[in-house]
Amino acid sequence: MKLDIKNTYSIIKTIEWRPFMRAKLLGIVLTTPIAISSFASTETLSFTPDNINADISLGTLSGKTKERVYLAEEGGRKVSQLDWKFNNAAIIKGAINWDLMPQISIGAAGWTTLGSRGGNMVDQDWMDSSNPGTWTDESRHPDTQLNYANEFDLNIKGWLLNEPNYRLGLMAGYQESRYSFTARGGSYIYSSEEGFRDDIGSFPNGERAIGYKQRFKMPYIGLTGSYRYEDFELGGTFKYSGWVEASDNDEHYDPGKRITYRSKVKDQNYYSVAVNAGYYVTPNAKVYVEGAWNRVTNKKGNTSLYDHNDNTSDYSKNGAGIENYNFITTAGLKYTF
């Protein structure tokens, strides 16, 4: 989307609503803890210090988040895409887990950036329907900041195998994550009504161009496990969700065309793989490194816009796309109390 917004086109997404399938799949998630608890029907709930472990780590966050615009009246073709890229943002990460009984554990985890981090944003438009594969307008914003990013995760695990040197279990949980960006200054190449890529210029340095926020909410299911040999331990977790609810907010700050775009997407897919390796420096303390890859796949959703200058609004379907992927690396300490 151009910063001067030459055209205000109608946008959005129609999500096919399948109540039966959605209820069935969500039911699997909600009943997983009940099924897991059957393994522990004869166990007594005990709260002792030996049942609690916590970890804290420092690391980096890198990735890319994307927003897309589709034109429903032209068959839903993509007419705009903004790519927000970020690298090596410093984060702090923590978790606490409580083994309620040998077969059941509950946990909470989360991470947050320690400050803003420089990034990059590229905004491209494909406005010529007769040549949809060639972009007509582009702006680049190397002065882009990841203002903040964070995530929290609440989960329950049911251990199918739980021995001193190895564990394997099913898990279910709820997770939310947020990202915020601001793009300033930059340069552009636009196409006028009479020409092609014939309008070239730049925006004032430091001037806000676009602000963007994403939020992801999801229940999920997964598989987790670990294996220990002497003082070395390897672990891994896989998580999946088909019920991601994503939303975003795009603020165009051009004084001449001050517009807010808001989009919502439902039932997106989420995949996450995490692997860690650690060494026990004492019987209760382990140092470890971990890598985690996460992805929310693109899907169309509903969009609304509000023009602050003339106080008008619009709403349309099949016009928005939201996507995110990131990679987290951390090193930290885990301690069992």
Language-model segments: what does each one mean?
Residues 54-62, 108-114, 170-178, 225, ...:
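Transmembrane beta-barrel strands of outer-membrane/channel proteins
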Residues 9-11, 69:
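Short, positively charged and aromatic/hydrophobic N-terminal segments
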Residues 102-108, 163-168, 231-234, 283-287:
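Repeated loop/turn-to-beta-strand initiation elements of outer-membrane beta-barrel proteins
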Residues 94-98, 152-158, 172-174, 221-227, ...:
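Residues on the lipid-exposed face of transmembrane beta-strands in outer-membrane beta-barrel proteins
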Residues 39-57:
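Outer-membrane beta-barrel biogenesis signature
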Residues 64-89, 112-152, 177-216, 241-274, ...:
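Extracellular/periplasm-exposed beta-strand and loop segments of Gram-negative cell-envelope proteins
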Residues 12, 20-39:
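Gram-negative bacterial Sec-dependent N-terminal signal peptides
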Residues 155-182:
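Internal, conserved structured core segments that host functional sites
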